[in-house]
Amino acid sequence: MRRILPDSLSLRRVAGAVLAVVAIVVVFLVVDLGPTTVAKMAWRRAQKVADARNRWVTAHESGKLAAPTPADAARGFSVFTRSTLLRVGDRDAPRQGEVPAALHVQAAWNQYEAAQLAVHAWKAVDGLAIAATSLTDASGHEIPASAVDLRMERFYAIALSIHVHNRFGVVPKTLEPAVPVAAAAGTTRPFWITVHVPDGQAAGRYHGTVSIRAGDQAVDVPLDVDVLGLALDEAPMLLGPLSLPVLRNYTRAGPRRATKIAERAGVAFHDIREHGMTTLSLWSAHTLRRDAGGALVLPDLDVAMQLFGRERFPKPLLYAPVNLLSTNKLGRAATYRHYDSSVAVPLAREIATTYGARAAALGLPGLILDPIEEPNYALGLDRHDAPDLRQKIATELLAAMKQAGATTAMTCTPETALVGKGNLDYWLVAYKRFTPGVFEKARKAGAHLAMYANATLTGNGTSFSRFFFGYWPWATGLEGMTAWTWPMTPKRFPANLDPARAEGALDVHDGFLGRDDRPVPTIQWELAREGVDDMRYLATIARLAARARSSGDAGAVRAADEADAFLASVKAAVVRDPHRYTFEDPKTLAPRKAFGWDWTDFEARRRSSFELLAKLSAFAG
């Protein structure tokens, strides 16, 4: 007993000392970071431990599988089609209704319309390749084969959801130019096919072929394209990525590197416009210059304005001079320690006056200034600063810019939007904090209401990306939809978290370019374009219906009535609460109907839109 008792006391003393140290650390963290942050850290750690056994999720197919035909078995592979809103897994076999494969798309002038084709290997095959022919109509008009973009989907091991912690899976993510690849037995290779209808293309149905080949085996899949003989209207609101950093280092670079940076920025601007976006938000450089007369020069903004005008964006350019004003929130509060009101406020005024006039002189649609990144109440400048210090900065900068004649914007919550005090024109409200009541709050404040929903572009959903860049903002009367950020920026390009589980990139250089020297898109980026086109169809229908009705012709009025009823039905099918729309199980990514919407509803409404425009175009004159 004499030996045991001291040992027990020693253990108690050690345990007490450990607990004391832990308590001291916890107290220090609470004082340094705040109780809310510490509680969140503890909760995340608990989730990691609890979810350790459920980290990797395998998606299971739904629907009855289609047995391979004798020809498929002899060939060694089957070819099938699937909606672009439904993922093709790396081992998915064709389901009933997906074979025999046939592709059919509908598009207006200068529209890009996508379809999805996949190959399931019953046995190992080498040199699996895809090719497309030109398309012709009954009168001999042709859409060249070069207008059919063929890309292979690449599989990545990635986090499945921003809502459910610690869930990972293997999903198709990027779209690289298609090259011959091998396919092991039991695996599947999906392909993304985008048809671009040239301006002025004769209306009608065009026929062509997409061929899948492996060695001496081949399958020819019919490709039909219905062309609408008109161009879609531009989307009627601000649509585009936020905080694009492509010119951030431009002012610090030497001549050769600066030229390269500007070229890469041009690639980004072109791709964003090509995807139907109406604007973008540029994240500023860190330094400014003065000309010989002392006038303000922002080289990054000068380049951006030139590119913006070249690409003919139809809405104002957003510029966030947060690096110049020391108001960005990277590194949390660190940058605000350099904020100097005596410097930032006059600079904010000067940016507004100088570059507002320059935008007008260049014939741009306008310039919107966003002087500070989301001044939420959870973060102050330092642990000893007043919690509203960032809000006071926002108030004084917005006032300075507005007094100088600027149009202003700010990423915000419904609460922090109030710091604008009448000087905030565009509320860019975070999706997580967006509620139906925000519409009325913005109206009372006399502000334009927009949302930023980052998961639309940098998440891993499908229908979510399309819905929130299309039907939802149009039906709710929103005036802008944005997201952080362009998903192909080199630092944000998708990362394959487990090369043993997924293949990742095949041929990507400079961090975001494919073998064709074009940006390698993500599936979400392509689906956002589909959403923009949904909106453009609706806007064009509304305009042509009004014109048809004003003509007084009985047939035109009937067509206008049908169009108006369709538009009303779309609005009635959408509710203002964005959080009702979870199109997938967040734990497994299995698709599910979201408040009356699934992939079949998207496709049915697009078909109706196309048919209505074809009918209305007869009365367009």
Predicted regions mapped to residue ranges:
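Membrane-interface motif at the C-terminal end of an N-terminal transmembrane signal
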Residues: 25-45
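Solvent-exposed, conformationally flexible loop/turn segments
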Residues: 107-112, 184-188, 203, 348
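Aromatic-lined carbohydrate-binding surfaces of glycoside hydrolases
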Residues: 120, 156-176, 180, 187, ...
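Catalytic domains of carbohydrate-active enzymes that cleave complex glycans
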Residues: 348, 352-386, 396-415, 494-621
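Surface-exposed binding patches on compact interaction domains or structured appendages
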Residues: 40-99, 122-193, 201-202
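N-terminal Sec-pathway targeting helices
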Residues: 5-22
